[in-house]
A protein has these predicted regions:
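Condensing-enzyme catalytic core mediating Claisen C-C bond formation in acyl metabolism
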Residues: 33-95, 99, 161, 171, ...
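Claisen-condensing/thiolase-fold acyl-transfer catalytic domains that form or cleave C-C bonds
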Residues: 1-15, 109-184
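Short, well-ordered, mixed-charge alpha-helical segments that flank or form enzyme active sites
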Residues: 1-2, 27-31, 68-71
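Flexible, glycine-rich phosphate/dinucleotide-binding loops
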Residues: 28, 57, 69, 120, ...
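Short beta-strand segments
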Residues: 19-25, 51, 168-172
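General beta-strand structural signal in soluble alpha/beta enzymes
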Residues: 21, 62, 134-136
Length: 184
């Protein structure tokens, strides 16, 4: 989501017509194969997303970045391993992500959420209004980290193009939340 906001600004402020965003994460090399608390949550993934200027395309309707204090080391990539406090990450989703989505989601058709995994994704969906279309694909890919939203958009591209207003919401690593509202 942060890369998309940056690409949007570059295209609109610097007369660039196209920008390629590439994401890639290989968390498997940092996860202990015997750690059953983290191993099932993360997948390796990569994406390449071409952002192209169109006069009648989506326009920015608002954005927000929120960084949460990381003093408790709830999700940290240390030298050769990942440490995660699962309950603290779920707390982030419920106490920080949900209220921000509710503030930003007025009049949107669809919310494209980071695919954090079954538990967090289902909790978020249950806390948000049923009036939103909230597609998921964590069942197929797991948590693709920075590639989760690009892959989700690719899988739902026909529907994405039909939407009038959408909200993209990335959250997680570094305990941050980023929202980008787009509309036609």
């Amino acid at each position: 989501v942060d890369a998309l906001m940056l690409a949007y600004d570059i295209i609109n402020n610097n007369n660039k017509s196209k920008i390629l965003i590439v994401t890639s994460d290989t968390y498997s090399k940092f996860i202990n194969k015997n750690d059953r608390t983290i191993r099932p949550l993360f997948s390796d993934g990569a994406s390449a997303t071409l952002i192209k200027y169109k006069k009648k395309g989506f326009k920015s309707l608002g954005r927000k970045n929120l960084n949460i204090s990381n003093t408790q080391k709830d999700l940290i990539l240390e030298k050769d391993k990942i440490n995660m406090n699962g309950p603290a990450v779920v707390s982030l989703a419920l106490n920080e992500v949900v209220p921000e989505i509710k503030r930003f989601s007025k009049d949107v058709d669809t919310i494209y959420l980071h695919q954090a995994g079954k538990i967090v994704s289902n909790l978020l969906k249950s806390k948000l209004s049923n009036k939103f279309n909230i597609p998921t694909n964590f069942e197929k890919f797991g948590n693709l980290v920075s590639s989760s939203i690009p892959v989700l958009l690719f899988e739902n591209f026909k529907n994405f193009k039909k939407n009038k207003k959408v909200l993209l919401c990335g959250f997680g690593v570094g305990l941050s939340v980023s929202l980008f509202k787009l509309g036609k």
